[in-house]
Structures are given as structure tokens and as C-alpha cells.
């Protein structure tokens, strides 16, 4: 399963392809074999740190408990 980048506004607000945004508490699963991407329950995956500084936010304390 592959997840897309998370948005800056929240670690678990993850973008599906085509600018579909999964709401808080959901993550995006990329569809395979022509299937559409789906938002499912689960923590978002942060984007890899190969972009610019400032693309990342600290994960809020409440998510770490």
C-alpha cells in the first residue's frame, strides 16, 4: 500500500491524486489497476524529507499519545 504526501495543514490530511483531500483521521490509498484512490480510516503518512525546509510541521502532541 502506498500513501500520498500529506498537506502542510495536518499530518493526517493526505492528498489523493486529483486533489482529493482525505479528512482528519483518514489516509489515502492509491488505487491500482485503474481503481480510484480511496480515503480510509488511519493516520496519514508524512511526506519524505526530500523537499524544501518548511514543508513540514511538527506532529501535534495529541497525536503522539
From Swiss-Prot:
Q: Name one GO molecular function term.
A: toxin activity
Q: List the residue ranges of the region (Interaction with thrombin active site).
A: 1-3
Q: What is the effect of changing residue 17 to A?
A: Slightly decreased affinity for thrombin
**Which superkingdom heads the taxonomic lineage of this protein's source?**
Eukaryota
GO CC terms of this entry: extracellular space
Which parts of this chain are annotated as the region Disordered? 39-65
Q: What is the effect of changing residue 15 to A?
A: Strongly decreased affinity for thrombin
* Places the protein is found: Secreted
Q: Name one GO biological process term.
A: negative regulation of serine-type peptidase activity
Main location group = secreted
Ranges annotated as biased composition (Acidic residues):
55-65
Give the intrachain disulfide bonds: 6-14, 16-28, 22-39
The annotated consequence of residue 4 to A reads: Decreased affinity for thrombin
List-wise, which residues carry Sulfotyrosine? 63
Similarity-based family: Belongs to the protease inhibitor I14 (hirudin) family.
Query: What is the protein's given name?
Result: Hirudin variant-1
What's the source species for this entry?
Hirudo medicinalis
Amino acid at each position: 500500500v502506498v500513501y500520498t504526501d500529506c498537506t502542510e495543514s495536518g499530518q493526517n490530511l493526505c492528498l489523493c491524486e486529483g486533489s482529493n483531500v482525505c479528512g482528519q483521521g483518514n489516509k489515502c490509498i492509491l488505487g491500482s489497476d485503474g481503481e480510484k484512490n480511496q480515503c480510509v480510516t488511519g493516520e496519514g503518512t508524512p511526506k519524505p524529507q526530500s523537499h524544501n525546509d518548511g514543508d513540514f510541521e511538527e506532529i501535534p502532541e495529541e497525536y503522539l499519545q
